[in-house]
Amino acid sequence: MESRTPSIIDLNAELAKLTMFRRTPQSTRADTKGSVARLASYRDGLLLAIKASGTDHWERHLTGDELVHILDGTATLEIVCDDGPPKSFALRAGMIAVIPQGAWHRALSAEGKTEMTATPFPGDHIERDVDDPRSIDGKPAGAMAVMPSIIDLNAELAKLTMFRGRTPQSTMADRKGSAGRLASYRDGALTATKFAGKGHWESHLAGDELIHILDGTATLEIVCDDGPPKSFVLRAGMIAVNPQGAWHRFHSSEGVTLMTATPSPSEVIEFDVDDPRTAKHERA
């Protein structure tokens, strides 16, 4: 079978390599060198880490929503939501924005921001500092009328309790209060979870899954090839991209807090087996 090794990224280490760059709409890729890191391929785009201040160009993404996670600093998101003027949203460290597919948007930051983005390609951009990108693009927004999802991740995590003793047979009712749906994202959802124990084997049929370890540690077990499942130890500040269709599960002895961008539909195995290929699976 084709190798499906996950991408494992130490986000904190990658951020430490970057320097803050003051952007303008005319800034080129060469200008921003050293302030942007390509972390991994993800679905039809890239995971990026960015340190920037100033005013970015207007852009829009044609194939899917963009995920923006502010890790440090503050920013203002300007976005075209409908036929009216662009709207502004203040973002601070610990907040997430899901920017709808096709929506013109840009970020401004006076003092600087550090962020991680999941950015789909291709896209359009405008390298001029204008109040409304439609004055340059010449195309109406149409019947978009879609607002971005703005999530205060720290506030959402504070609502959750650690679920200890999780097993592959644990139900949604068992897990109530330990997991929360943050927002819709592409063909699935953003979720946050706190648990200790062992999750079920699962496989996502529509695309890669993005995992961000926010606190604690966990072991990712994943079927990468024809051999036995491989194990990867993840700690706070690390990211994993689980390839589309790859069977995987997590276990954590002391507890882990994680955020996921999970596509649907999925298949799951609610038995504690060493290899999911030996068991019957169900559609979730």
Locate each region found by the language model.
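Ligand-binding loop in jelly-roll beta-barrel domains
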Residues: 92, 101-129, 235, 244-271
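A short, N-terminal "cap"/entry segment at the start of jelly-roll beta-barrel domains
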Residues: 1-50, 132-193, 280-284
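Glycine- and acidic-residue-biased ligand/ion/polar-headgroup-sensing regions
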Residues: 54, 63-82, 197, 206-225
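Short acidic-glycine-tyrosine-enriched beta hairpin
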Residues: 82-101, 224-244
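Structural motif
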Residues: 46, 74-76, 114, 189, ...
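His/acidic/aromatic-lined binding-pocket segments of jelly-roll/cupin-type domains
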Residues: 58-61, 65-70, 88-89, 107, ...
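Short hydrophobic/aromatic-rich beta-strand segments that constitute the beta-sheet cores
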Residues: 49, 77-79, 117, 192, ...
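Conserved short histidine dyad/triad with adjacent acidic residue
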Residues: 46-62, 189-205
